[in-house]
Amino acid sequence: MPADRYRSGMIPVMAESPPFAGIASFFKAPYVADPRASDADVAVVGIPYDEATTARPGARYGPRAMRDASTNWAYRDGTAPFYDGEAGASLLGGVRFVDAGDVDLPPTSPPERSHPLIAARIRRLLEHGLFPVILGGDHSITYPVLTAFGSRPLHLVQFDTHMDYLNDEGGMLYTHASPIVRSHESGVVQRVTQYGIRGLHTASDQIELARERGVTTFWCEQAKRAAVEELVAHIEPGEDVYITFDIDALDPGIAPGTGTPEPGGFTYYEAKALLRAVAARAHLIGMDMVEVNPLYDPMEITALHAVRLIFDTVGAALSER
C-alpha cells in the first residue's frame, strides 16, 4: 500500500480487503479524523446519542450498525460507479467517501452540552466543502446539525412517521419529538416538507401548529397513492434542501429496529423513488439517517435498508455532479 496514504492521515480500507475483514468504516472508506487531510466529496459522521428518546433506547448503536451494514457494498473500488439495473442508471460514480468518525459526546450529556459539540463538528466539515451524511442517533440530533449551516435559507425535507413538532415533552424542549419545531421556529430552516406521517402519536395541536406555520405535510397513505412528480412539485428547482430520514418512515415489516414503530409506512421502493426525486430536483446539501435501533432487529435488515437509502440519495444528488 502506498506509504503516502498513511502519511496523509488516511487509513486505506476501501477495496483492499473483503467486506467481512478489516476496519468497518462506512462503505470501507478511508477513516479521516481531520477532513482537511482528504479530497473527498462526502464525509460520514456518526452521532451515537439517544439521551433524548422518549421510547425504546438503543439508537446510540445506530452508527455502528449502519457502518457494519454498509460493508455489504464494499466491493466498489475507489470512485467506480455501481450500476442500478432497476433504475437504469449508474450510482455514486466519481463520488469519494471518507468516514470522519463519531462526534465525541460524554455519556448522558444534556442538550446544552451535546448540541454545541455536534454543531461544531458538522461546521468543520462544511467549511471544507464536504457533503455531510449523518448517522444517528435519535432524531434530536437533527436540530444541532442544522444550526451548523448558519443563516443560509434551507428547505428541510423530513421522512418520518411522526411530525416531531411537539413543543415540549414534560417540559423538555429538545427531545426526539421536537427537532422539527425547534428548527422551524428558530429560523434555522425556512421551509419544511414532511412525507409519511401516520399513526397515533401526532396530536391535533401539533398538526394545527405546523399548518399555521406553513409546513407542507403529505400523510403516508396520501404519499403512497400520489405520483412522485406531484409530491415534489412544490420544491423549487435547485433550492438548498437538507433531508432528515427517520427510519420509522418505513414499514416496520422491513425496518423493525427503531424506537417508536407504527403499522404501515413506506416500502423500500417507495422511499427510494421519493428520495431520488427530491435529490434530483433540489440542490441537496446534506442528510441524516436517524432512529436506527439495532437492539430490536437481530436480522440487521433495518440498518441494511437505511444504508441502501443513503446510497440511493447521495447517488441521485452527487453522481457525476
Spans of features found by a protein language model:
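Conserved alpha-helical scaffold segments that buttress catalytic/binding sites
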Residues: P2-R321
